[in-house]
Amino acid sequence: MDVLSCSINTLKGLYDISGVEVGQHFYWQIGDFLVHGQVLITSWVVIAILLGSATVAVRNPQTIPTGGQNFFEYVLEFIRDVSKTQIGEEYGPWVPFIGTMFLFIFVSNWSGALLPWKILQLPHGELAAPTNDINTTVALALLTSAAYFYAGILKKGLGYFEKYIKPTPILLPINILEDFTKPLSLSFRLFGNILADELVVVVLVSLVPSVVPIPVMLLGLFTSGIQALIFATLAAAYIGESMEGHL
């Protein structure tokens, strides 16, 4: 009987874990289109956090920065260093783009662990980090693709497209595909890491006391920051390569 009872309890625990759903969405009907409502909601929250923090930090700028102003100046200097290292001396115009990518991804990733999204109940699905949705990460990848196409064309004009037929026109399809697969690989890596991190925490919380998953959550925060840095760094590297023609 003890063995049977243990087996039943084990199966019940597995059944509870199987209730964790992935891919459930809350849709908004806009004309003939279905829009993922929860992604827009969480993205707006992240944008509001970034804009609100920046506004509060620099509303009274000081010659000798302190507090929030000092923190944001440090972040800006860090983003400038990353951009200059990857793009080169012409990095200046691209600092806002790289900085936006880094900060949006960083805050989005951390929001999945630190913000109590589940307090807000939706008719379908649930709120989670924006980067927990493949649509967000693919959109970021497409923005990166558009950025380095723009950078290359701005630098070289229509001569930028000559690289697609070098060293031989036979490689044209492969060269075109390569330009799109590189940023898309970034999007899948980012999506997979954030989704896996949140699923691991959910499963551990359902199996063990709430204290045990804390180390996993801390590790998740660390890896989330690293993922934001990797995405921003490689985006800057692709832009730099597009301008230099060393793809």
Curated annotation (Swiss-Prot):
Highest taxon of source: Eukaryota
Keywords of the record: ATP synthesis, CF(0), Hydrogen ion transport, Ion transport, Membrane, Plastid, Transmembrane, Transmembrane helix, Transport
Entry's transmembrane regions: 33-53, 95-115, 134-154, 199-219, 220-240
Subcellular location(s) per record: Plastid membrane
Keyword Transmembrane found: yes
GO cellular component: a single term: proton-transporting ATP synthase complex
GO molecular function terms noted in the UniProt entry: proton transmembrane transporter activity
An annotated GO BP: proton motive force-driven ATP synthesis
Main localisation: plastid
Membrane association type: Multi-pass membrane protein
Pfam families membership: ATP-synt_A (PF00119)
InterPro entries for this protein: ATP_syn_F0_a_bact/chloroplast, ATP_synth_F0_asu, ATP_synth_F0_asu_AS, F0_ATP_A_sf
Family to which this protein belongs: Belongs to the ATPase A chain family.
PANTHER family in alphabetical order: ATP SYNTHASE SUBUNIT A, CHLOROPLASTIC
Function as written in the Swiss-Prot or TrEMBL entry: Key component of the proton channel; it plays a direct role in the translocation of protons across the membrane.
Subunit structure: F-type ATPases have 2 components, CF(1) - the catalytic core - and CF(0) - the membrane proton channel. CF(1) has five subunits: alpha(3), beta(3), gamma(1), delta(1), epsilon(1). CF(0) has four main subunits: a, b, b' and c.
The protein's name: ATP synthase subunit a, plastid
Source organism of the structure: Cuscuta exaltata
Source lineage: Eukaryota, Viridiplantae, Streptophyta, Embryophyta, Tracheophyta
